[in-house]
């Protein structure tokens, strides 16, 4: 990227002094908004075609401008375009390059258009495409989770379910996997819903009030793949809620991926030992030869913070900006780019890592059996026998306390101890409350019983097909 001030600014007619060098550096956005170059040129091609269709430009003028824009696009794709800081942004870089290439007729491209609607349409195009791309990547990860759930259903692998990170009740590993698949289904829906709401073209709104030129906004909207033009020109150029909605969906997805990461990190530790992450997605230590660090999961967890920050940053930018365009809105893009890039790679990594993760069913089953995970089942046994549940809860709570104080499990208690707590209890009853039976008993809709989880998997596969 070069930095020269030899050219007159395309907006410089009103000014008698050159722009201060530090202001030029501070004002420029081309270092990051050049990423919108393809969208910018697509918008310009749609605009100039419409100017020709409506008779505002002659066929020859349209042809010259189109040929020039296509040449610039080829240079950009080949990496030989000279991005210049003194030309501020992607729009002025492209327009100035067009003028250098085809001469004064390039100035007619901006007829009936402002940089305000130009940047708005570029940014909407990018954000809509990013939302749909992330939706597709989320869908791919959903499919991986569902496939893993189906695989582990074959052996009905049991995992401890937790509340407060303490063993609560036994569940199927497949049930746990399907919980994350359900979260991602909603994430995918949020991106698709956001893309549908932002499917309106602001091109033709001009600076803020529309234009007296006889343009056809419906034609440019259709040419760019939008469903319709924005209904209000002021809203079209002055609103960034489409970017906020995208970042909100990104933040919620990042939170879900962070929760998954946290559990994978915990479960891969020596203390848990539930799973082994693949060597291909872990790293070692420069000093401790035994270490196998879950860097992918840790970075996915850590990067959630920057995605949250991108949402809060843009909310803070737009909350105090009066209609319509303000230079503050230059700050809307980097957070969107960053969140998209961050989540794109995390989703791809997880889709690759999860099928290679090895679960240790013997360890997870043993862990599920500890911590009095079938205590609720014992209380339910009493309740089914006619004991009020609150009374049953208290009885079993006392037994848990006794077993805990004496270093035993519920099934280790004697007949005498159990009958002393309640005459309906016995050692035979306690021993019958296995983690397998506990899991099988949870047959309510959405529960962890194998037949219920199979229903969840079947429904998810049907939704993905």
From Swiss-Prot:
GO biological process: arginine biosynthetic process via ornithine; L-arginine biosynthetic process
Subcellular location: Cytoplasm
Catalytic activity, EC: 4.3.2.1
Keywords: Amino-acid biosynthesis, Arginine biosynthesis, Cytoplasm, Lyase
Keyword Glycoprotein listed: no
A Pfam short name: Lyase_1
Protein origin, superkingdom: Bacteria
Major location (coarse): cytoplasm
Listed PROSITE patterns: FUMARATE_LYASES
Protein name: Argininosuccinate lyase
Homology family: Belongs to the lyase 1 family. Argininosuccinate lyase subfamily.
Pathway terms, separated by semicolons: Amino-acid biosynthesis; L-arginine biosynthesis; L-arginine from L-ornithine and carbamoyl phosphate: step 3/3
Originating organism: Deinococcus geothermalis (strain DSM 11300 / CIP 105573 / AG-3a)
GO molecular function terms noted in the UniProt entry: argininosuccinate lyase activity
GO CC annotations, alphabetized: cytosol
Catalytic activity, reaction form: 2-(N(omega)-L-arginino)succinate = fumarate + L-arginine
Enzyme class per UniProt: lyase
């Amino acid at each position: 990227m070069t930095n020269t001030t030899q050219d007159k600014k395309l907006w410089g007619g009103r000014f008698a002094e050159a722009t201060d060098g530090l202001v030029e550096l501070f004002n420029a956005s081309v270092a990051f908004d050049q990423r919108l170059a393809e969208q910018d040129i697509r918008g310009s091609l749609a605009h100039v075609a419409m100017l020709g269709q409506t008779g505002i430009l002659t066929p020859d003028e349209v042809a010259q401008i189109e040929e020039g824009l296509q040449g610039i696009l080829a240079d950009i794709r080949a990496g030989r375009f000279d991005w210049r800081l003194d030309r501020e942004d992607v729009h002025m870089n492209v327009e100035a390059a067009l003028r250098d290439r085809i001469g004064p007729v390039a100035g007619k491209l901006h007829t009936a258009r402002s940089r305000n609607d130009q940047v708005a349409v570029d940014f909407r195009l990018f954000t809509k495409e990013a939302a749909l791309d992330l939706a597709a990547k989320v869908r791919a990860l959903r499919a991986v989770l569902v496939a893993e759930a189906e695989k582990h259903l074959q052996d009905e692998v049991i995992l401890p379910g937790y509340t407060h990170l303490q063993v609560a009740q036994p569940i199927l590993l497949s049930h746990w996997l399907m919980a994350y698949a359900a979260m991602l289904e909603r994430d995918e829906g949020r991106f698709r819903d956001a893309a549908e709401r932002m499917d309106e073209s602001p091109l033709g709104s001009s600076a803020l009030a529309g234009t007296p030129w006889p343009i056809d906004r419906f034609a440019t909207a259709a040419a760019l793949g939008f469903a319709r033009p924005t209904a209000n020109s002021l809203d079209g150029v002055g609103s960034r809620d489409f970017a906020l909605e995208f970042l909100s969906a990104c933040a919620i997805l990042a939170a879900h991926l962070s929760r998954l990461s946290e559990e994978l990190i915990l479960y891969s530790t020596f203390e848990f030992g539930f799973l082994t992450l693949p060597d291909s997605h872990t790293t070692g230590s420069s000093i401790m030869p035994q270490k196998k660090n879950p860097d992918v999961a840790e970075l996915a967890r850590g990067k959630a913070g920057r995605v949250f920050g991108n949402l809060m940053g843009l909310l803070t930018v737009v909350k105090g900006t009066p209609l319509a365009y303000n230079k503050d809105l230059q700050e809307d893009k980097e957070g969107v780019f960053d969140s998209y890039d961050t989540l794109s790679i995390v989703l791809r990594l997880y889709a690759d890592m999860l099928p290679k993760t090895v679960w240790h069913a013997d360890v997870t089953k043993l862990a599920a059996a500890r911590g009095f995970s079938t205590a609720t089942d014992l209380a339910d046994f009493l309740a089914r026998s006619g004991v009020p549940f609150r009374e049953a809860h208290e009885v079993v709570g006392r037994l848990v306390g006794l077993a805990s104080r004496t270093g035993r499990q519920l099934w280790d208690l004697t007949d005498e101890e159990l009958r002393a707590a309640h005459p309906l209890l016995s050692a035979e009853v306690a021993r019958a409350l296995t983690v397998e039976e506990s899991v099988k008993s949870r047959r309510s809709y959405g529960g962890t019983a194998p037949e219920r989880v199979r229903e969840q998997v079947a429904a998810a596969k049907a939704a993905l097909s």
